UniProtKB/Swiss-Prot annotation:
Disulfide bonds join 36-70, 45-63, 54-67. Keywords: Disulfide bond, Ion channel impairing toxin, Nematocyst, Neurotoxin, Potassium channel impairing toxin, Secreted, Signal, Toxin, Voltage-gated potassium channel impairing toxin. The keyword Disulfide bond applies. It is found in: Secreted; Nematocyst. This is U-actitoxin-Avd11a. Inhibits voltage-gated potassium channels (Kv1/KCNA). Residues 36-70 form the ShKT domain. It comes from Anemonia viridis. GO terms for cellular component: extracellular region; nematocyst. Residues 58-59 are annotated as: Crucial for binding to potassium channels. Belongs to the sea anemone type 1 potassium channel toxin family. Type 1b subfamily. GO terms for molecular function: potassium channel regulator activity; toxin activity.
Length: 70
């Protein structure tokens, strides 16, 4: 009996090194991808900030500008 254990298959969209090179070649895309914006409404993000929930990863990503994550 032979058992083979392998890690998950690498997919072409998992090529992180290629992604980094792509970002370096086109700096205008880097600025667009990492823009400092709130992705939820301003009232939603204000309430997150007032409840001091910026430490929770989900809220920090939704309200990057309000929580000061960028």
């Amino acid at each position: 009996l032979v058992v083979s254990v392998t890690s998950r298959r690498v997919r072409f969209w998992d090529d992180f090194e290629r992604d980094e090179n792509f970002e370096e070649e086109r700096p205008y895309l880097r600025n667009v991808k990492r823009a400092c914006n709130d992705y939820k409404s301003s009232s939603y993000c204000r309430s997150v900030g007032s409840r001091n929930e910026c430490g929770i990863h989900k809220y920090r990503m939704y309200c990057r500008k309000t929580c000061g994550s960028c």
